[in-house]
Amino acid sequence: MNDTIPATGHLLGAADIRRIAADAGISPTKKFGQNFVIDPGTVRRIVREAGVTAADHVMEVGPGLGSLTLAILETGATMTAVEIDPPLAERLPGTVAEFMPEATSRLTVVNRDALTVTPENVPDFSDDASFTLVANLPYNVATPILLTLLERFDNLGSFLVMVQKEVADRLAAKPGSKIYGTPSVKLAWYGTAERVGTIGRNVFWPAPNVDSALVKFTRYQADDPAAPGTANSTDDGTQRELVFRLIDAAFGQRRKTLHAALKTIAPSEAFSIAGIDPTRRGETLTIAEFTALAKAIESCGDGDEAQ
């Protein structure tokens, strides 16, 4: 990975953003959680933290007016931008043509809700070649987008996303923490996450009411001994579904013991097989322990009718 990114293109500043928005008749909307980055230094920092190089294929979700898009293209990478808002999706190629015309052939724009994206409707990512996600995600749907993309794209190898600071803290939280919860554990099924920096409110237009932070994620390799269960295998997802059911139940009643919270899913015998004390709470379990419990339930038979 490159340690530095050459500043070769014209990236968007505050005046550029406001002019583009005015020319296109676009206003940021709360519906889509739109806050546009107006600071070139911030988007270059995001791309640098992501380690993007010219050899990479990048997905961006929610490109907006193109601030981060241009910073990604500046590296020489090929990218696909997924934008839910039709006017913004229509405008983006023109912005790239205006500010970085040599990069237009490396950009594909898909007008689609990221929660509906699949390898079939975004064929650029349908093969086995690994790709990375780099995005300033809409705060209200950041976690669902990440978990959905990781489930549907086995070749999503890493991501660097900017999200609300509180969301970043939860995504990277460890067992035993007060903020450790469903997002933390489910993300840990796929790989490892860490918070790698904070972003102030003044780099956005309009300025949000919350601070932002960067989360970096690396997916487990298929042969990684740290990978829980069959997280990276070609199975039908049955084990993951059971693990996620356990997680949802355990954190849906956070203050209850595992025995109480999981009484309709996990028979008492399963705790013994997994070597897990049923008086513990879900917030103390690692993803490996949730997976061990799921395997134990499977070995006991039908986990739907726990006794």
Swiss-Prot record:
GO terms for molecular function: 16S rRNA (adenine(1518)-N(6)/adenine(1519)-N(6))-dimethyltransferase activity; RNA binding. Keywords: Cytoplasm, Methyltransferase, RNA-binding, rRNA processing, S-adenosyl-L-methionine, Transferase. It comes from Bifidobacterium longum subsp. infantis (strain ATCC 15697 / DSM 20088 / JCM 1222 / NCTC 11817 / S12). It is found in: Cytoplasm. Its EC number is 2.1.1.182. PANTHER family: DIMETHYLADENOSINE TRANSFERASE, DIMETHYLADENOSINE TRANSFERASE-RELATED. One of its GO terms (cellular component) is cytosol. This is Ribosomal RNA small subunit methyltransferase A. It catalyses: adenosine(1518)/adenosine(1519) in 16S rRNA + 4 S-adenosyl-L-methionine = N(6)-dimethyladenosine(1518)/N(6)-dimethyladenosine(1519) in 16S rRNA + 4 S-adenosyl-L-homocysteine + 4 H(+). The keyword Secreted does not apply. Pfam families: RrnaAD. The keyword Aminoacyl-tRNA synthetase does not apply. It is an enzyme of class 2 (transferase). Belongs to the class I-like SAM-binding methyltransferase superfamily. rRNA adenine N(6)-methyltransferase family. RsmA subfamily. It comes from the Bacteria. S-adenosyl-L-methionine binds at N35, V37, G62, E83, D113, N136. Specifically dimethylates two adjacent adenosines (A1518 and A1519) in the loop of a conserved hairpin near the 3'-end of 16S rRNA in the 30S particle. May play a critical role in biogenesis of 30S subunits.
